[in-house]
């Protein structure tokens, strides 16, 4: 929005052209979302307290979680609001990738909001019926996959189209799984669906301790922002042997907004948390990360950088599978962070150690740019 305005003003004075620079707009995006989150945070917390939108604690949760009862939830609304405003202000709104990510954010955020609201309003931990949740998240993720496929196939360069659809294998030069050979982009669309929904649910499962999910989200968004910047520049992409994708540079503005909004939320979510993000935040943020990973064609690297999210999700699958097949537990409690709590780790120890793991994994993900 402001990019368009400054482009009009550039005709009157050349100094307005400075806003065209992606690096400046990305920095302004961070500062804008950070400021919005910090300023509106106390207001949002007071409003949630007044509405009595407090967190319910499961009877199966570790004993030390009882003190979290009543802490305001649905704080993810503030995160999404900060990201949305910052993106609309500083991103190039003619870029289709910007609107796809925002669309995914809105739909997954709405599903998360409905899930949170039902849990609070009706004291029902089941939340939104699984069929409705599945339907709307499927609409958003499949819609994103179809849109990305159509954008890719509009290009006249067949090699470029293949680069936008095939699954890149990290640590190797020019090695990929050819999803593009399946007619009508079915393999690509289904794979996109799995990545977006998998990321959304994995982040949601991770969001069980104060600050545990939001900081890895910030770190992974930073890593994806680097890939978005490099893959959107044909010179960097060719030099680093990564796919050049025409529209991805503008995703840096969105990643920057996620970083600023996430850090602002962490200010109030740090232990002891004053507010929780709820499903409205976790589902949307995970879906956004998954969508951006698909756009920059770095799904496997995304799984590496988001290894904490992967471990949390896998721990739940293993626990459920083992209980059904063997009637035995693999972990003391799932997701994984609760297992370590049961072993005697303090909440802050679990959180900070998972942050450290994420830092190392994001660095490893970035190393794939040169280790080929």
From Swiss-Prot:
Cofactor list: Mg(2+)
Please give the Pfam families that the UniProt record associates with this protein: Glycos_transf_4
Question: How does this protein lie in the membrane?
Answer: Multi-pass membrane protein
Q: Does the keyword Transmembrane apply?
A: yes
Gene Ontology cellular-component terms for this entry are: plasma membrane
Which coarse location class describes where this protein primarily resides?
A: membrane
Kindly give the InterPro entries that the UniProt entry links to this protein. Answer: Glycosyl_transferase_4, PNAcMuramoyl-5peptid_Trfase, PNAcMuramoyl-5peptid_Trfase_CS
Stored PROSITE patterns: MRAY_1, MRAY_2
Write out the entry's keywords from A to Z. Cell cycle, Cell division, Cell inner membrane, Cell membrane, Cell shape, Cell wall biogenesis/degradation, Magnesium, Membrane, Metal-binding, Peptidoglycan synthesis, Transferase, Transmembrane, Transmembrane helix
Transmembrane regions: 25-45, 73-93, 98-118, 134-154, 176-196, 211-231, 251-271, 275-295, 300-320, 349-369
- Do you know which CDD domains this protein is assigned to? GT_MraY
The biological process GO terms on file are: cell division; cell wall organization; peptidoglycan biosynthetic process; regulation of cell shape
* Function summary: Catalyzes the initial step of the lipid cycle reactions in the biosynthesis of the cell wall peptidoglycan: transfers peptidoglycan precursor phospho-MurNAc-pentapeptide from UDP-MurNAc-pentapeptide onto the lipid carrier undecaprenyl phosphate, yielding undecaprenyl-pyrophosphoryl-MurNAc-pentapeptide, known as lipid I.
Q: Which family does the UniProt entry place this protein in? A: Belongs to the glycosyltransferase 4 family. MraY subfamily.
**PANTHER family referenced in this protein's UniProt entry, alphabetically:** PHOSPHO-N-ACETYLMURAMOYL-PENTAPEPTIDE-TRANSFERASE (PTHR22926), PHOSPHO-N-ACETYLMURAMOYL-PENTAPEPTIDE-TRANSFERASE HOMOLOG (PTHR22926:SF5)
Q: What is this protein called?
A: Phospho-N-acetylmuramoyl-pentapeptide-transferase
User: What is the source species?
Assistant: Acinetobacter baumannii (strain AYE)
């Amino acid at each position: 929005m402001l990019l368009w305005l400054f482009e009009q003003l550039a005709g009157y004075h050349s100094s307005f052209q400075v806003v065209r620079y992606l690096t400046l707009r990305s920095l302004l995006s961070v500062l804008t979302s950070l400021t919005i989150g910090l300023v509106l945070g106390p207001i949002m917390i007071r409003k949630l307290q007044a509405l009595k939108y407090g967190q319910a604690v499961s009877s199966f949760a570790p004993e030390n979680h009882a003190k979290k009862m009543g802490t305001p939830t649905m704080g993810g609304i503030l995160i999404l609001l900060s990201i949305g405003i910052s993106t609309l202000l500083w991103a190039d709104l003619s870029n289709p990738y910007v609107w796809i990510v925002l669309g995914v954010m809105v739909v997954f955020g709405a599903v998360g909001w409905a899930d949170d609201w039902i849990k609070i309003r009706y004291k029902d931990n089941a939340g939104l019926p699984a069929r409705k949740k599945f339907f709307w998240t499927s609409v958003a993720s499949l819609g994103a996959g179809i849109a990305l496929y159509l954008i890719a196939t509009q290009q006249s360069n067949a090699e470029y189209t293949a680069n936008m659809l095939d699954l890149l294998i990290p640590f190797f030069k020019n090695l990929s799984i050819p999803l593009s050979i399946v007619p009508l982009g079915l393999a690509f669309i289904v794979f996109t669906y799995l990545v977006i929904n998998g990321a959304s649910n994995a982040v949601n499962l991770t969001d069980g301790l104060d600050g545990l999910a939001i900081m890895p989200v910030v770190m992974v968004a930073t890593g994806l922002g680097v890939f978005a910047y490099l893959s959107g520049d044909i010179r960097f992409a060719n030099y680093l042997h990564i796919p050049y994708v025409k529209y991805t540079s503008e995703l840096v503005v969105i990643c920057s907004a996620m970083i600023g909004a996430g850090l602002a939320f962490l200010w109030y979510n740090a232990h002891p948390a004053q507010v929780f993000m709820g499903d409205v935040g976790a589902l949307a943020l995970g879906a956004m990360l998954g969508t951006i990973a698909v756009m920059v064609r770095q799904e496997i690297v995304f799984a590496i950088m988001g290894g904490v999210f992967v471990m949390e999700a896998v721990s739940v699958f293993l626990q459920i599978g083992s209980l059904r097949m063997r009637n035995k537990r693999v972990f003391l409690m799932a997701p994984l962070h609760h297992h370590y709590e049961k072993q005697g780790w303090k909440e802050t120890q679990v959180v900070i150690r998972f942050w450290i793991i994420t830092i190392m994994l994001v660095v490893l993900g970035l190393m794939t740019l040169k280790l080929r």
